[in-house]
């Protein structure tokens, strides 16, 4: 219980740093946004209790609607708050996709396992929706937060989409084979490692806060800029780690087949 509360506090802190120094919002706005998004993620977690179900479970149209509505609530909230604070449409899109693609999916291990395990039972229209969000959302995020260049952002978005597809293709083949093993040869083992890696993000919030205090005391604005670049580097490092883990999943699947 204490660990979960601490994680929530660190998550709020990390988001606060993001809004304050990357999105350039005010202190009160950043704090409010951080709390709102953490609460939204908790609501989303409650809606996804059915994540405990295994591959034999088939989603009903009502449950698919719940997923879409819960995700849309995060996205619409991003747009609304951005407009209220005087932001541009691109900023609203970037914030919305950022929380869908990078925070919500990787923050919740149950969500990740549900997506992978229930992949064969998902309605095709829902899969298209997922794919579209990953491709377009990743491109927008890379453009707004990392590169600022359209071509580079499109390439990075396509690579992210390719990883998304390869992971699900690996898992689909593995799930439909009916063979599950609790070892490193199980692709899900690698997916859990991704989640644990992403959860290290709150530690960046602590480091960013320390950097901010140091910057204010020494009046060195470059330290704040360093914090922003650290955040951007974290996004890129995440993609690199996912690449490595995807390769590991593929090799693990091959080893398991030979065994």
From Swiss-Prot:
UniProt keywords, alphabetically: Cell membrane, Membrane, Transmembrane, Transmembrane helix
One CC-aspect GO term: plasma membrane
Chief place where the protein resides: membrane
Lineage of the species this protein comes from: Archaea, Methanobacteriati, Methanobacteriota, Archaeoglobi, Archaeoglobales
Lipid bilayer topology: Multi-pass membrane protein
Name of the molecule in the record: Uncharacterized protein AF_1569
Transmembrane segments: 9-31, 84-106, 126-148, 153-175, 196-215, 230-252
Annotated compartments: Cell membrane
Keyword Protein biosynthesis: no
Entry superkingdom: Archaea
